[in-house]
């Protein structure tokens, strides 16, 4: 079920998407709610699964993981056992940072963050040796032009004016 967000929820989410380290005092000042009201709303948003997690975003380049690889996978097999095996391999591979099942010509898309081509090759060999795949192709990113973790939120009314 999708939670109905009011203007204050949207304002809090907007602020936290930009800075998850914002204090209750800062959130209170920017929303016009008390710090306690902000805290209660955040707890409800977490309990309802609207806020999934609060994380620190790292710069892959600065920690030696400067190669982004998109792996396009086609397969002939689609059974639950096959998918369970595939998921297990993906879940035990920390290089895989995103994983999607797609509609269209490609069945699955993986996004990897690796330090080197040889690290990608090691993962590729592990994958093809343990999962029956029809086709695997890799696309190496030359440059990241946009990356955002901020989701678009509905506009708020005047009650909780956005001040980011």
UniProtKB/Swiss-Prot annotation:
Gene3D superfamilies: 3.30.70.920, Winged helix-like DNA-binding domain superfamily/Winged helix DNA-binding domain. One of its GO terms (molecular function) is sequence-specific DNA binding. This is Glutamate uptake regulatory protein. The keyword Transcription applies. Keywords: DNA-binding, Repressor, Transcription, Transcription regulation. One of its GO terms (cellular component) is cytosol. InterPro entries: ArsR-like_HTH, AsnC-type_HTH_dom, Dimeric_a/b-barrel, Tscrpt_reg_AsnC-like, Tscrpt_reg_AsnC/Lrp_C, Tscrpt_reg_HTH_AsnC-type_CS, WH-like_DNA-bd_sf, WH_DNA-bd_sf. Represses the secondary, H(+)-coupled glutamate uptake system (Gluemp) genes. PROSITE patterns: HTH_ASNC_1, HTH_ASNC_2. It comes from the Bacteria. The keyword DNA-binding applies. One of its GO terms (biological process) is response to amino acid. Residues 24-43 bind DNA. Residues 5-66 form the HTH asnC-type domain.
